[in-house]
């Protein structure tokens, strides 16, 4: 298990805060070399992330990616507006300027925030879907400049095509390859105008993101029941993009809510340190959430969002910060029992590493379970066409359909998941924490954990490309194995690792995309000791697999 830093959950010493001037200076002065792996564009479903201080998120990265997206749009025939938003990380605004310079030079119609404010990821998804509704041509797409809950020195840039959700690999690989080619060619072929000219360009337009999103919220959450109940709500935007949205929501719907802090500071000095002593706006971490958890008795229900507001953290009174898996299970149970206009065949979307409590809830409410690999992109089609009522990940990211049963967003929306916690509390007269406690009495108590174990790049490749026969296990912690999967049962897509299940427990193992470790997710419905046995057997089986491969290579 990782060792918890002595600084975890405590205010960060001013001496340890990031130097914003140095960060911004490095953005412009450091020139990435695409021959160095760590300095290349690596554009996954969460986009490209890095830091200017490590030459992994700099001006040339953003100019190249923006040109690659302009090229992709042209090739794909995407001619509608590109909705663009930023979060509150220090590198987000300079990256926006770089992107606008390229998009304007390419004649791309771009919609920027009317007030030069911040725009959450779900708001961009909502804007794309709203614009594209009932259109078959001149479709819109979008860009969100955010590294999500990553530390203050990081930047991020992600692309959402016309379906409004995260771009899949068929798009991201094209963008990544083209961007790296531009950098390798010393930026030859990258079109650019000055920032002043970009702002004055007829294709750069101001857009009110706040009003349409806020006005539409009653179509997805029952704002009337929240207001009429008078339930007291605490909200912490964690200094992120949702900071511009909560007051308009409170004013529009008259709910009894308090924003505990509206402070925005690119050093995020108001945060308490995460488990490793780093600042991270992770609303599912009890260490990063110490401020709001400390206020748990002041409100009936409280919640926070990460920096781009695609994730949620629910503080449920005496129960404190809810484990994301627990809240997903409660949200699913509540929604499918209280959305009478949803299609009776709409399913429950979960990832292979999310709690099996969700499986038990889906069975209890008589809904189809759709289990997919890790990544919200796998829920996009289901949410878009209404075959999924809900899609959620154990990392506290989820979205669900409008009350009428049609698509709301195809990206994670931490704002509606927070408001849903208030709706549950208002309608049922009990918090999601109490609802989960009741659920365990009926369906059992799961013991769930994720641990990291070391793995070099060769070992990570072995794990990613496994076949079920290679694992060779017949029992898991004293129970016969029911399934060994390397492809997700919900859609047949590769897990990028494996999942082994028995009656009362399971584990999944998959390599990290960024570090030399692999992750073991495990769960027991018996006890903490049984969970430990599952984790030990999982690690032993994978170590044996690595040893066998090393032996084979040596031979």
UniProtKB/Swiss-Prot annotation:
EC category name: isomerase
Binding-site positions, substrate: 45, 49, 148-149, 158, 310-311, 393-395
Catalytic residue list: 148 (phosphoserine intermediate)
Keywords attached to this entry: Carbohydrate metabolism, Glucose metabolism, Isomerase, Magnesium, Metal-binding, Phosphoprotein
Residues involved in Mg(2+) binding: 148, 306, 308, 310
Organism superkingdom: Bacteria
Positions of disulphide bridges: none
Co-factor note (free text): Binds 1 Mg(2+) ion per subunit.
Matches recorded under Pfam families: PGM_PMM_I, PGM_PMM_II, PGM_PMM_III, PGM_PMM_IV
The reaction(s) this protein catalyses: alpha-D-glucose 1-phosphate = alpha-D-glucose 6-phosphate
Cofactor or coenzyme needed: Mg(2+)
GO MF terms held by the record: magnesium ion binding; phosphoglucomutase activity; phosphopentomutase activity
A GO BP annotation: purine ribonucleoside salvage
Family, as annotated: Belongs to the phosphohexose mutase family.
Role description: This enzyme participates in both the breakdown and synthesis of glucose.
Name this protein carries in UniProt: Phosphoglucomutase
Lineage: Bacteria, Pseudomonadati, Pseudomonadota, Alphaproteobacteria, Acetobacterales
């Amino acid at each position: 298990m990782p060792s918890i830093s002595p600084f975890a959950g405590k205010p960060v010493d001013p001496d340890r805060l990031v130097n914003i001037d140095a960060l911004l200076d490095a953005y412009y002065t450091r020139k990435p070399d695409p021959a160095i792996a760590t300095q290349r564009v690596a554009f996954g479903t969460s986009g490209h992330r890095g830091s200017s201080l490590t030459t992994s998120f700099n001006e040339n990265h953003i100019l190249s990616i923006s040109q690659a997206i302009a090229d992709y749009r042209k090739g794909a025939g995407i001619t509608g507006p590109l909705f663009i938003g930023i979060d509150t990380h220090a590198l987000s605004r300079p990256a926006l300027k770089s992107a606008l310079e390229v998009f304007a030079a390419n004649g791309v119609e771009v919609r920027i925030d009317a007030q030069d404010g911040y725009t959450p990821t779900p708001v961009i998804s909502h804007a794309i879907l709203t614009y594209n509704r009932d259109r078959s041509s001149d479709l819109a797409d979008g860009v969100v400049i955010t590294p999500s809950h990553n530390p203050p020195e990081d930047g991020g840039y992600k692309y959402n095509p016309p379906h409004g959700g995260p771009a899949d690999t068929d798009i991201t690989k094209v963008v990544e390859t083209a961007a790296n080619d531009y950098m390798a060619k010393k930026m030859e072929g990258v079109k650019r105008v000055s920032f002043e000219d970009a702002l004055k360009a007829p294709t750069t337009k101001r857009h009110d993101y706040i009003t349409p999103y806020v006005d539409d919220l009653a179509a997805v959450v029952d704002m009337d029941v929240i207001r009429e109940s008078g339930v007291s709500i605490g909200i912490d935007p964690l200094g992120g993009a949702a900071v511009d949205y909560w007051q308009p929501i409170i004013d529009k719907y008259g709910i009894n809510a308090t924003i505990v802090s509206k402070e925005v500071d690119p050093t995020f000095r108001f945060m308490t340190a995460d488990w490793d002593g780093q600042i991270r706006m992770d609303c599912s971490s009890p260490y990063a959430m110490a401020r709001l958890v400390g206020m748990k008795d002041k409100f009936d229900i409280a919640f926070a969002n990460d920096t781009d507001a695609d994730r949620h953290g629910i503080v449920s009174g005496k129960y404190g910060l809810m484990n994301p898996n627990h809240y997903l299970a409660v949200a699913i149970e509540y929604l499918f029992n209280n959305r009478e206009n949803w299609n009776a065949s709409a399913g429950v979307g979960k990832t292979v590493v999310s709690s099996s409590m969700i499986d038990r809830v889906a069975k209890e409410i008589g809904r189809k379970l759709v289990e997919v690999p890790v990544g919200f992109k796998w829920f996009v089609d289901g949410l878009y066409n209404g075959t999924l009522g809900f899609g959620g990940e154990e990392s506290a990211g989820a979205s669900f359909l409008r009350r009428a049963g049609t698509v709301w967003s195809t990206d994670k929306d931490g704002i509606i998941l927070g408001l849903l916690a208030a709706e549950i509390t208002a309608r049922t007269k009990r918090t999601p924490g109490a609802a989960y406690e009741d659920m365990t009495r009926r369906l059992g108590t799961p013991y769930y954990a994720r641990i990291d174990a070391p793995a070099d790049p060769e070992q990570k490749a072995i794990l990613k490309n496994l076949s079920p026969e290679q694992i060779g296990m017949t029992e898991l912690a004293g129970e016969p194995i029911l399934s060994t999967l390397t492809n997700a049962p919900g859609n047949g897509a590769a897990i990028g690792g494996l999942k082994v299940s028995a009656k009362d427990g399971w584990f999944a193992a998959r390599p990290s995309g960024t570090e030399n470790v692999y992750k073991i997710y495990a769960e027991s419905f018996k006890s903490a000791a049984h969970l430990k046995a599952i984790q030990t057997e999982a690690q032993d089986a994978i170590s044996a697999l690595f040893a066998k491969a090393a032996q084979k290579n040596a031979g």
